[in-house]
Design a protein with these regions (language model features):
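Sequence/fold signature of self-assembling virion shell proteins
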Residues: 2-50, 60-78, 134, 175-293
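Long, contiguous amphipathic alpha-helices that act as assembly "spine/axial" helices in icosahedral shell
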Residues: 42, 64-124, 153-155, 159-162, ...
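Residues that scaffold the ATP/ADP-binding catalytic core of kinase and kinase-like folds
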Residues: 52-53, 172
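Short, polar loop/linker segments at the starts of domains and inter-domain junctions
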Residues: 54-60, 101
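Residue-level detector of alpha-helical recognition elements and their boundaries
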Residues: 57, 115-116, 256
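Alpha-helical scaffold segments that mediate packing/assembly in large oligomeric complexes
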Residues: 84-152, 261-280, 284, 289-292
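Short, catalytically relevant binding-site loops at active-site mouths
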Residues: 118-119, 167-171, 207, 293
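Extended, solvent-exposed, turn-rich assembly/linker loops in the middle of proteins
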Residues: 122-191
Length: 293
């Protein structure tokens, strides 16, 4: 029977590889230091200490605080194939199958990731009830402000990201300080675009009307594919493949992320530019007489 030749590691590897290529959360989060069963451990390092030198040296122990996370979210997939053997031998069919399921899994994983990150964010510009009006003239500036919020908390300069949705990316594209033709890679990276030290990312899995800036140390995330198996289906003449994905996320540093609540403004929200011209002896306006006028 075809299912006797099923190779679970082959499918798991293909699924995870495709997942990594499309999940934005994997780029933004800290990976776990250790995974034991359904428990994940992240190590948070305490701040360093400087002392005045007076002829002797006192040694400090490196202090790490283990932060535990349980895989509290579980999703499964199950699909039927006419012949598992044939699909495993045809790389294009297997790639398409695993890529599609990896994309669906990544969407759910990223959506939960951003919801957790926002819930743990304390540095806010605007609020859910008082959103900032954003136009092409100030969209870039608000992202600069998010980066400034992180800098004021002394968040490390490297591994900073800011994630926007397609609407916000469109507003940025109309600002001369940004590119007018942004290229979004498969994993959400907006190629070559950095604002105030933050790599610009794009995702539609963000909470509505929110832009989030974060350092990788702000949140940890992990997932596992469990129970990958094949079986002969009784209800149809086909083989079935199913798998269970368990995952979770944990906010590690509340001061390492900042969020903007916004709504897209209209032309009426753009501040008018008033130019006042005076023409007197102190501030004369140079004019030129036109012959025959």
């Amino acid at each position: 029977m075809a299912v006797d030749n099923f190779k679970p590691t082959l499918w798991e590897g293909a699924l995870i590889a495709n997942f990594h290529s499309v999940s934005i959360a994997d780029v933004l989060a800290t990976p776990p230091a250790d995974i034991k069963g359904n428990k994940v451990i992240f190590n948070r390092i305490a701040g360093g200490t400087l002392k005045d030198y007076e002829g002797s040296v006192d040694w400090d122990e490196i202090d790490t605080t283990p932060v535990e996370m349980i895989f509290d979210k579980k999703k499964y997939f199950a699909f039927a194939l006419d012949d598992v053997d044939k699909v495993q031998l045809k790389a294009d069919v297997m790639t398409a199958t695993t890529k599609e399921h990896a994309a669906v899994l990544a969407e759910t994983y990223d959506k939960d990731f951003f919801a957790a990150l926002l819930a743990g964010t304390k540095l806010l510009i605007g609020s859910s009830s008082a959103k900032k009006k954003v136009t092409p003239l100030n969209a870039y500036d608000y992202i600069v402000d998010l980066g400034t919020q992180l800098s004021k908390k002394k968040v490390p300069k490297v591994n900073r990201f800011v994630t926007v949705n397609a609407d916000y990316l469109g507003l940025l594209s109309k600002d001369k300080r940004f590119t007018d033709n942004p290229k979004v890679l498969e994993n959400g990276v907006v190629e070559g675009q950095v604002i105030n030290g933050m790599q610009v990312m794009c995702s539609e899995e963000l909470p509505a009307n929110v832009v989030i800036a974060n350092h990788k140390s702000a949140i940890g995330a992990a997932k596992q594919i469990n129970e990958m198996e094949a079986m002969r289906l009784q209800s149809k003449f086909a083989d079935g493949i199913r798998g269970l994905c368990v995952y979770g996320d944990k906010v590690l540093r509340e001061d390492a992320s900042a969020a903007l609540y916004f709504e897209v403004g209209t032309a009426a929200d753009v501040d008018p530019i008033n130019v006042k011209i005076t023409n007197d002896t102190k501030n004369p306006v140079n004019t030129k007489e036109v012959a025959g006028a």
